[in-house]
């Protein structure tokens, strides 16, 4: 599938999981959004007879037209008795707020007595907007959160729509005559749903490693929303701050019994599945497309294979085109190992060793002489550059495999079936045993250590406490992953790219997912007044004439600074707190202790800090007497020295402020 074809399929995960009555009538009330075509197709693919009407059409239908008569101009359709009605952008684009209530009252008369209305909408109180995303209608930060109070009456009339909160939507529905409704909180976005949670269900898993946030304006984001999910859950804010909603409305007290729905439409039609946790204690997995029906048979076969190899799996059975499993009330393996590391490091290591042993025995091992070493790195065959392709040493890993005992131990076992998803994210701890699920795929001839590396990465992802308790490097050394880590990441990256179509969707993700360095830059601006920020981060070369320049830091930031500016500014020295670097050099410049600043005349030098976490360094050099301090941001373009690039005088400001926060 092409990128555009996949992107068109992404929103379908919102409703394709639902058990619609096939052969019944559905009405799609359309606004002017980008979901319309995809959601209309979803209803048709679910076996419904779908009719469409524009929002203003429905609003203009007279009462007698809704008594069952056929009306000219509407394709001879009968304007009553719909089993299902769906509205998406029409919710946000109807005249606020009375206009939406009026529209919903009219929609109510079109439903059968046991019919269902579905609303799809964003949430003005979404966590994404607290993290710096722009409102989709005003194009500015925080307008929805403030309920559009800073938007003038004139501008409000020109807006294409507005967002509502969960409380507002609840009130609107009840005023419109829909007393029964169930909200499903959608993450990360209604245009690209990954997971939906019913409002009466509290998730009990590490969502920070499952959800990939996305935004209307990723360049203005200053906070990583996934770090807030756990606190939102603990404080009863999770559903109130969901990024979007699917709302199921009924005239009777009957709604779906689904509690959580996970969808994977980004994987393409053959691999897209949904997993539904239902209230009766069961979990149902089913394909989202007819092309994926064979996946369930493979899932069942993989379960049997792994159980034969000593891996305990959640028991499941194939029932009417679905894979049905019991709901397991156990602690997620991510939470288990994170807690265990914090409480008892020795016991953590013992149990992590058990996990490694389980991975090693999850499949037969392939003899080294049976491995196709010329294609062992899956990235080799993806290289499009002909010159680079010729430079690939295809015998590299064969030399390791048939080298010394130490080399072979470093590379490790190659599994006949490498279940690369045999990871903490897909497992529970039940009565002291590890129980796994969702083993849909395996990779042939996979290094076992690639699976272990994924587990370590998931354990440390987004939780800085883990690094303090037990540095990640120690686990890499314990399982001898460091010397051949390149080949493990090659297999992991290849697998994930193919599974999630990351390469195909690269431009889409670039437009909607945040850049961590930009987030860092945006956030640091918020700690200073405009004048302070200008002095510290923008005018870092100001008043440098006749002063010695020292760099604080000798890592990647310093290397980039030197590559760009050392020919224009004389660097007197580099200082660093790392004692092991004192007396060594970076790009020919000696690295010294920060104490070299003591005793210097503060007016004769300037320090430019070249490290990411600059706060401590800033305080340190200030305490050492420095008064001229700048902080280098590698994401910022600074003016070149006069005569090097510009013909005119410098203004003392940046050439271009690439990223911004606040109103556009």
Predicted regions and their residues:
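ATP-binding glycine-rich loop module of kinase domains
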Residues: 260-305, 326, 333-337
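Catalytic activation segment of kinase domains across protein kinase-like and atypical kinase folds
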Residues: 138, 143, 397-468
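Conserved alpha-helix/loop element of class I SAM-dependent methyltransferases that forms part
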Residues: 2-24, 533-538
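Hydrophobic, well-ordered beta-alpha structural blocks that scaffold small-molecule cofactor pockets
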Residues: 508-664
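A short glycine-rich, Lys/Arg-flanked "PGG" loop and its adjoining helix->strand segment in the class I
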Residues: 99-116
């Amino acid at each position: 599938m092409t990128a555009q074809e996949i992107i068109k399929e992404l929103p379908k995960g919102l409703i394709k999981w639902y058990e619609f009555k096939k052969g019944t009538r559905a009405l799609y009330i359309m606004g002017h959004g980008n979901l319309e075509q995809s959601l209309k197709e979803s209803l048709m693919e679910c076996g419904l007879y779908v009719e469409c009407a524009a929002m203003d059409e429905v609003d203009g239908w007279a009462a007698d037209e809704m008594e069952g008569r056929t009306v000219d101009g509407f394709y001879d359709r009968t304007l009553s008795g719909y089993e299902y009605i769906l509205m998406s952008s029409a919710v946000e684009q109807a005249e606020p707020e009375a206009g939406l209530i009026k529209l919903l009252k009219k929609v109510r008369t079109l439903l059968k007595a046991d019919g269902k209305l579905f609303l799809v909408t964003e949430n003005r109180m979404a966590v994404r907007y607290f993290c710096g995303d722009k409102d989709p209608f005003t194009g500015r930060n925080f307008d929805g959160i403030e309920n559009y109070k800073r938007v003038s009456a004139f501008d409000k009339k020109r807006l294409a729509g507005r967002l509502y909160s969960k409380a507002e939507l609840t009130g609107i529905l009840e005023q419109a005559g829909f007393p029964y409704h169930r909200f499903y909180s959608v993450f990360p976005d209604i245009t690209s749903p990954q997971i939906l949670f019913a409002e009466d269900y509290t998730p009990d898993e590490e969502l920070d490693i499952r959800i990939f946030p996305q935004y209307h304006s990723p360049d203005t984001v200053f906070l990583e929303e996934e770090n807030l999910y756990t606190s939102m859950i603990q404080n009863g804010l999770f559903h109130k701050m969901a990024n979007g909603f699917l709302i199921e409305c009924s005239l009777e007290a009957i709604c779906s019994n689904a509690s959580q729905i996970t969808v994977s439409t980004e994987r393409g039609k053959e691999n897209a599945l949904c997993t539904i946790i239902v209230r009766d204690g069961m979990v149902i997995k089913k394909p989202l497309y007819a092309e994926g029906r064979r996946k369930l048979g493979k899932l069942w076969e993989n379960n049997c294979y792994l159980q034969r190899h000593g891996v305990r799996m959640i028991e499941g059975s194939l029932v009417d085109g679905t894979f049905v499993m019991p709901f397991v009330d156990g602690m997620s393996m991510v939470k288990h190992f994170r807690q265990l590391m914090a409480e008892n490091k020795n016991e953590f290591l013992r149990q992590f060793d058990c996990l490694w042993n389980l991975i090693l025995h999850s499949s037969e091992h392939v003899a080294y002489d049976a491995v196709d070493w010329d294609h062992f790195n899956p990235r080799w065959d993806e290289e499009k550059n002909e010159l680079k392709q010729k430079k690939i040493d295809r015998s590299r890993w064969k030399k390791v495999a048939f080298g010394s005992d130490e080399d072979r131990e470093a590379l490790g076992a190659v599994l006949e079936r490498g279940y690369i998803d045999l990871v903490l994210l897909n497992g529970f701890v039940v009565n002291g045993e590890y129980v796994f699920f969702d083993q849909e795929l395996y990779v042939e001839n996979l290094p076992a250590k690639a699976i272990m590396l994924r587990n370590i990465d998931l354990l440390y992802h987004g939780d800085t406490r883990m690094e303090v308790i037990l540095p990640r490097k120690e686990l890499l050394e314990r399982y001898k992953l460091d010397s051949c880590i390149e080949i493990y990441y090659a297999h992991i990256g290849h697998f994930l790219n193919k599974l999630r179509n990351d390469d195909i969707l690269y431009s889409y993700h670039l437009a909607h997912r945040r850049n961590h360095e930009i987030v860092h830059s945006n956030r640091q601006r918020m700690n200073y007044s405009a004048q302070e920020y200008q002095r510290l981060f923008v005018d870092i070369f100001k008043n440098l004439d006749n002063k010695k320049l020292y760099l604080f830091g000798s890592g990647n930031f310093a290397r980039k600074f030197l590559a760009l500016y050392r020919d224009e500014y004389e660097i007197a020295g580099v200082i660093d707190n790392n004692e092991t670097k004192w007396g060594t050099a970076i790009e020919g410049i000696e690295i010294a202790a920060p104490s070299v600043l003591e005793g210097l005349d503060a007016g004769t030098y300037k320090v430019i800090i070249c490290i990411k976490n600059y706060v401590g360094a800033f305080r340190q050099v200030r305490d050492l007497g420095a008064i001229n301090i700048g902080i280098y941001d590698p994401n910022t373009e600074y003016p070149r020295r006069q005569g090097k690039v510009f013909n005119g005088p410098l203004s003392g400001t940046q050439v271009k402020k690439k990223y911004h926060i606040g109103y556009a």
